[in-house]
A protein has these predicted regions:
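A short, proline-enriched helix->beta-strand linker immediately N-terminal to the Walker B motif
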Residues: 113-117
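Conserved ABC ATPase "signature" region
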Residues: 18, 70-89
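Conserved ABC ATPase signature
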Residues: 93-98, 102
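Short, glycine/charged-rich "phosphate-handling" switch motifs in NTP-dependent
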Residues: 167, 179
Length: 229
């Protein structure tokens, strides 16, 4: 890692093994093979000059000793795994020809090339609308169970944390100030910062009493537009 990205007291461990100052060979064995990452905005991660299928195929060839045909077949299988529709056609699409949700699915497919133990998802749904957010979260939950991997989900959206996470860590100024079972932390937050975050959540609107007498009632209203002759 670049020296400016951490202090002398920094430590990053995975399975009890220190990653900071690890050799290049050790890092290469980790990246993609054991730990993969999905970023917030897929358009900044995908190469706009190459078809998405070729980009997945390249990842397969980089990490596996297989033929180009086998790599393409694996890329198509990965696209099916992340529930891309019409994979044969989408394989030959450029990033700008896909929707935001489809591009994020492509990024997830690339991250899963080597079936990693840990998938780091950094705000993976922030750039998506609410409906697509739910689809991507459902997909990630499904893949987590099918592949037996862990997901480190980084987000500022408390609603997503409550819905998606089993365990939660609350960070303030780069330090973990509270961690525990998601339900426990949300129901009984102990740290003042966690309490402030939860208190800042928008409260749902009150139910409207539809049984009260309406102030005004209009029926059988028609609108007509004169068309020029």
């Amino acid at each position: 890692m670049p020296q400016a990205s951490y202090s002398e007291n920094s430590s990053i461990k995975f399975e009890s093994k220190e990653i900071i100052n690890a050799s290049k060979q050790d890092l290469l064995s980790l990246r993609g093979n054991i730990i993969s990452m999905v970023f917030q905005e897929p358009m900044t991660s995908l190469n706009p000059y190459h078809k998405v299928g070729n980009q997945i195929t390249e990842s397969v060839l980089l990490h596996s000793k297989v033929s180009k045909k086998e790599a393409k077949d694996e890329a198509l299988n990965l696209m099916k795994l992340v529930e891309i529709d019409d994979v044969e056609r989408r394989f030959n699409s450029y990033p700008h020809e896909l929707s935001g949700g489809q591009r994020q699915r492509i990024m997830i497919a690339m991250a899963l090339v080597n079936k990693p133990k840990l998938l780091i998802a950094d705000e993976p749904t922030t750039a998506l609308d609410v409906t697509i957010q739910a689809q991507i979260l459902d997909l990630m939950s499904k893949l987590k169970e099918e592949l037996g991997m862990s997901i480190l989900f980084i987000t500022h959206d408390l609603g997503l944390v409550r819905e998606f996470s089993d365990q939660v860590c609350v960070m303030q100024n780069g330090h973990i100030v509270e961690k525990g079972n998601t339900d426990d932390v949300f129901k009984n937050p102990e740290h003042s910062y966690t309490q402030k975050l939860l208190n800042a959540e928008p409260q749902p609107k009150l139910d409207i009493n539809t049984e009260e007498i309406p102030l005004i009632k209009i029926e059988n209203v028609d609108v007509f537009y004169d068309m020029p002759s």
